[in-house]
Amino acid sequence: MRNKGDFLFTSESVSEGHPDKVADRISDTVLDAYLAADGESRVACETLVTTNRVVLAGEVRGPSSVTPEALIEGARAAIRDIGYDQAGFSWKNAQIESYLHAQSADIAVGVDSAGEKDEGAGDQGIMFGFATRETETLMPAPLFYAHGILHRIRDLRKAGDARVAMLQPDAKSQVTLRYVDGRPVGATSVVISTQHDEGASQAAIREALRDVVQDVLPEGWMCPEDEFYANPTGVFVIGGPDGDCGLTGRKIIVDTYGGAAPHGGGAFSGKDPTKVDRSAAYACRYLAKNVVAAGLADRCTLQISYAIGVSHPLSVYVDLDGTGKDVDEAKLGSVLREVMNLTPRGIRQHLRLNRPIYTETSAYGHFGRTPDEARDNFTWEKTDLVDALRGAFNR
């Protein structure tokens, strides 16, 4: 997304009850179960969800205390927490099968370390991070508000608010914003599709959703009434995994920057932090956010690449999109290597990733979230490198 001129830009989000997000949630529940038992566990868990059936598959290495039965019960608890107790998909009677098996010894050889020697990356790949001064969380505005709308609906639904009592867990949102001189100034259209009880009034649903959107968007940003689309296809009773099959890792743009920045292609959920698809993408966001928070630029895109079995990144690329404040991008790339150890081990230690902190990342975006000091989560959203970055450029 460019940073100059007048244009429209759109991003979408999906709720925790979307089939693909149900799969992501279960995969991260499996991951957290292993990391809670042993922080050095290796996990690559894929999940398929469909009508009253859940299938777990992938590779793991961890303590035997994490039994298939425990993982199945964890998946069932996740479905219950999301809110599914429907004829076609219920936490009570969904058939859950686990086909998880041991991690490949060939992969383990390239990844494992000897003592304190840096281990190699779990795979080759490219990862991106991004930050922009458009919102208080330094996230792109269209995605920020698309997430915010669904998160607000979720909070109201789980709080038992009568206005949304007819709504069920599956939902999607899409927000189009108008930019003037490269800055967002208002919404031109908002789309929300949400699963609901049979017989629910579409007029009541529209009214409830309009109230949510107006609460989430800044004052004066609401789109014209004829560009507000609430359940535009009409009835949406059959939803969730009963309506569409869900798979882990199919919402990578929703998970990251809503299309406002490049994506390396690797999904996050179900992967332990030796997988640089996840951990290095978190590091890229962390560094990009700190660059913008330090006042070195208004926008920052960062790319890092790795090779399997090699500990150091093969490249670090920085693009400030013309918004740098007298900052040389090549020098900034070198400085970023200095302020953070970008080996897989270094990233995990710096961001404290070998902990069961992933379940809550599985919906409403991995980035732009608020760290909770008590739980020490979302560490990649902290801005604790600001002083070091300013010092490197004599600010």
From Swiss-Prot:
Instruction: Give the gene name.
Output: metK
Binding sites annotated in the UniProt record for Mg(2+): 20
Protein name (database record): S-adenosylmethionine synthase
Q: What is its EC number?
A: 2.5.1.6
Q: InterPro entries from the entry? A: ADOMET_SYNTHASE_CS (IPR022631), S-AdoMet_synt_C (IPR022630), S-AdoMet_synt_central (IPR022629), S-AdoMet_synt_N (IPR022628), S-AdoMet_synthetase (IPR002133), S-AdoMet_synthetase_sfam (IPR022636)
So where does K(+) get bound? 46
**Recorded metabolic or biological pathway in which this protein acts:** Amino-acid biosynthesis; S-adenosyl-L-methionine biosynthesis; S-adenosyl-L-methionine from L-methionine: step 1/1
**Residues that bind ATP:** 18, 170-172, 244, 250-251, 267, 271
Gene Ontology CC terms: cytoplasm
- State how it assembles: Homotetramer; dimer of dimers.
Identify which top EC class this enzyme belongs to.
Answer: transferase
Could you list this entry's UniProt keywords, alphabetically sorted.
ATP-binding, Cytoplasm, Magnesium, Metal-binding, Nucleotide-binding, One-carbon metabolism, Potassium, Transferase
Cofactor binding mode, per the note?
Answer: Binds 2 divalent ions per subunit. Binds 1 potassium ion per subunit.
Q: Where's it found, cell-wise?
A: Cytoplasm
User: Where are the annotated segments for Flexible loop?
Assistant: 103-113
Q: What organism is the protein native to?
A: Gluconacetobacter diazotrophicus (strain ATCC 49037 / DSM 5601 / CCUG 37298 / CIP 103539 / LMG 7603 / PAl5)
Free-text function comment from the UniProt entry = Catalyzes the formation of S-adenosylmethionine (AdoMet) from methionine and ATP. The overall synthetic reaction is composed of two sequential steps, AdoMet formation and the subsequent tripolyphosphate hydrolysis which occurs prior to release of AdoMet from the enzyme.
For this protein, what is any one GO molecular function term?
Answer: methionine adenosyltransferase activity
Species classification: Bacteria, Pseudomonadati, Pseudomonadota, Alphaproteobacteria, Acetobacterales
Required cofactor names: Mg(2+); K(+)
Primary localization: cytoplasm
Q: List ligand-binding residues for L-methionine.
A: 59, 103, 244, 275
Q: Which GO terms describe its biological process?
A: one-carbon metabolic process; S-adenosylmethionine biosynthetic process
Task: Fetch the PANTHER family from UniProt.
Answer: S-ADENOSYLMETHIONINE SYNTHETASE (PTHR11964)
Domain of life of the native organism:
Bacteria
Reaction catalyzed: L-methionine + ATP + H2O = S-adenosyl-L-methionine + phosphate + diphosphate
> To which protein family does this belong?
Belongs to the AdoMet synthase family.
